[in-house]
């Protein structure tokens, strides 16, 4: 109450920000006449003048009024579009590194031009990030002529481009592309084999379009580059056969093999389920008599079993995925689009493939990964724009340090948002939706129906066919036609069913898209035909406006109010009339899981009967409270994911920095020599403990260790017999000299140049190989870390501590393996070095995943998360090696001093 009173007196923070930015807009407006009088040449010359002023230590902020005035004038001349004041407001907010919330149809594409132009002047590059390839291509081609007129180059990053074209696109002043492509290019650059192969420059400034979709909806799904791991696809098929025999436990303590936690989107085997699983495994010969599913040797089976169970119980065809061309293709829950080439990780995708009877592709091992949260925080300056960000303002501020500024609309909003209508059953709800659609269709009012899944859109389509209502369906199966269908969704009486936010970024114009119709005539069409099309379009436009504009129907509430607002925002653009209504039932996911008791109680109190709908502010408020609860829950998960990924991010930063330094270095011989001294010192200390007496020395073991690990044959026992004065320090020096001598001989044979090249190639190969193994170990650690909570330990602290220990061990292994490789491999010519390079490239046959993220407490994942079961740890083949027995690797050392140390 006090806050409301203060904001009435002093204005909200948003009002105060807008007041200060409006002063700058007034300065831009004051320059409009002056710049309109300039010739094209004079206007174009401004770009070089601005760059000279920047070189003379003027700041970008000082250039805002003139630079924005130049872009506005260029927009009028090149595109025939003048930036409105609110668009300039948005541009200044973007330049300030904030998020501009602008309603649908307010021209966000044009808003970005002024901020992109200004920030491209220093020559460090600007990235404009969109949600799909179509929008990146469209926006770059649409705005490209404006930038070109002002002397700036434009590049586009598309998914099918070769590295040369990518590099050229990144060297442009302004580069358009999707979030996935920018993220994958960053990871690919950090797997490159030379600096010349890297395509990206330093990450300077990014404008993220649909920022809520990219930085919030997709924040829990990391980008992963992976390579094939050894895994039997036959096992997935064998285990898949058992799944129909398992029964769900319907009530607590009742019969059944598994329970489902819908809130957490998890499935758990009951005690009876464990016994049943073991029984079917025994019958099929996958387990032996007397074995348990939890024996170390059967952990792999358990991993496959859990993946198969989740595939059958939690993942549904035409909701979470579709089957197309003998492949399981994931459907993006936020956009309803298919994601070809993307795969769920950790065996889940293979289990779904087995369930659907398609070809099973091999399981993958992570080679590189990053979350969008950490990728976008690498930019020196970040800004974003969207139609719906205010509900998530707290998260943007907390995680990205981005403030949301709500920009007023150019024309007043006249859309009517009707209250929710709630029914008892889904059947009644669909019947009411069909009646509403028929009414609008009869009156010539266009309708857009938003659904949460392909299944719902196809069900509604079936009902409309029965009623003989002509309509178009836009979902993941038909997104090739997406822009065309959406562009014409505003024609009189048109009925369009769209999954979620498909077609985002394309405006629905009342009366249909005039530009699209004119384009069908071709460039040489006569004037009369064009005039006829314009006249017909105007008639249609007037008819739609008279019928009430575009009517939006929501078939259920999404977990996030923001996604609902996005659907509403398709109507009422630029002051157009329009209306929206959501139809709900107590059988909807959100209502059933999060709000059913409260709402059904309300309905009973209000005396509701079957077939009746309830429309009441209390109900709407109760639903929004349920949504707030889910949003808070999802925010906690994303925050938790970030806290865990920050640990990996620090390590990733160190490794990538080391890689870049290695690739940039001409000569790494000093580094190799320093590493060699440390590695030999550690090895000698295993057999000759520092400060020990000679009776404690294990000379045969040391000789064997040097020979097996580094190929160095030395007679240390002979040295000691010949020189009784040899003590620990001098012995270390003699061994070091012998190592240096052997290495020097190798260098003499091939020459210094080949050796330097080989050292660099070997270091990069070992670094990449060990980093890949480390990522797998980090995955294993993260999967089980939440169990530490049962031991009264803080899982986050334990994860940080153990991840650091793993990282230290990896660094030691890198040093050891580099020296072992350099010492043992025979190099004769440059061709041998090329062979090492070839091996590294072969090991990098990769696949790109935007896979389901795993959080610490997967048990608290949200309704639509796709967290994967834990990976199977390494399972020993054969008998256990005793700690004092020789290590099976052949080093000659005791197991406890060799590979036993890693355990």
From Swiss-Prot:
Its cofactor is Zn(2+). One of its GO terms (molecular function) is protein-exporting ATPase activity. GO terms for cellular component: cell envelope Sec protein transport complex; cytosol; plasma membrane. It is a peripheral membrane protein. PROSITE patterns: SECA (PS01312), SECA_MOTOR_DEAD (PS51196). May bind 1 zinc ion per subunit. It is found in: Cell inner membrane; Cytoplasm. Keywords: ATP-binding, Cell inner membrane, Cell membrane, Cytoplasm, Membrane, Metal-binding, Nucleotide-binding, Protein transport, Translocase, Translocation, Transport, Zinc. Residues 854-893 are annotated as: Disordered. It catalyses: ATP + H2O + cellular proteinSide 1 = ADP + phosphate + cellular proteinSide 2. Its main location: membrane. Residues 856-869 have a biased composition (Polar residues). The keyword Transport applies. ATP binds at residues 87, 105-109, 507. GO terms for biological process: intracellular protein transmembrane transport; protein import; protein targeting; protein transport by the Sec complex. Monomer and homodimer. Part of the essential Sec protein translocation apparatus which comprises SecA, SecYEG and auxiliary proteins SecDF-YajC and YidC. This is Protein translocase subunit SecA. It comes from Nitrosococcus oceani (strain ATCC 19707 / BCRC 17464 / JCM 30415 / NCIMB 11848 / C-107).
